[in-house]
Structure formats: C-alpha cells, structure tokens
C-alpha cells in the first residue's frame, strides 16, 4: 500500500506531471516550482505546481505526524515517571 503510493508519486514526473530541474552548480536536481523554459505550456506549468504542492503537503504531513508521535512519547514517559514517583512514596 504505502510503497505503491510512494512509487506512484515518484513516477509522476515520468508521466508528465511535474518535472525535476538541474540546480546550480549542476550536481543535483530538485522539483521545478515555476514555469519551465522555452515553449513550456500551461499544462506543464500546472503539473509543476501540482507536483510541488503535493511534495510540500507530504513533507508537512510527515512533520506533523512526527511531532504528534514525539508528543505522545513525551506524555507517556512523563506519566510513567510520575507513576513511579508516587509508587515509591
């Protein structure tokens, strides 16, 4: 399930939705966030915006899930420490 979704997202540029562009100094690439170069049509620009937006939403979602899991862990550890402290008294 998750692996198929990740594969589908990674293949979007191959299918023509969004694109990667080479970044300076030419040793790495990243998603294109703006209109392309010569002759880029509005469909390609829409694809770039869609892919960049999805990329950002997935990244922010991962950040929120990580933060929520960390908060749950902190809450569990604090309650466990408090329970041990009251049990030892």
Curated annotation (Swiss-Prot):
Glycosylated residues in this chain: 38
InterPro entries in UniProt: Prostanoid_rcpt
Cytoplasmic side: 75-89
Bilayer disposition of the protein: Multi-pass membrane protein
GO MF assignments: prostaglandin E receptor activity
Localization of this protein: Cell membrane
Disulfide bonds: none
Membrane spanning stretches: 1-18, 49-74
GO BP term (any one): negative regulation of gastric acid secretion
Domain of life, source organism: Eukaryota
GO cellular component: plasma membrane
UniProt keywords, alphabetically: Cell membrane, G-protein coupled receptor, Glycoprotein, Membrane, Receptor, Transducer, Transmembrane, Transmembrane helix
Assembly and interaction partners: Interacts (via C-terminus) with MKLN1.
Role noted for this protein: Receptor for prostaglandin E2 (PGE2). Required for normal development of fever in response to pyrinogens, including IL1B, prostaglandin E2 and bacterial lipopolysaccharide (LPS). Required for normal potentiation of platelet aggregation by prostaglandin E2, and thus plays a role in the regulation of blood coagulation. Required for increased HCO3(-) secretion in the duodenum in response to mucosal acidification, and thereby contributes to the protection of the mucosa against acid-induced ulceration. Not required for normal kidney function, normal urine volume and osmolality.
Name assigned to this protein: Prostaglandin E2 receptor EP3 subtype
Source organism (scientific name): Ovis aries
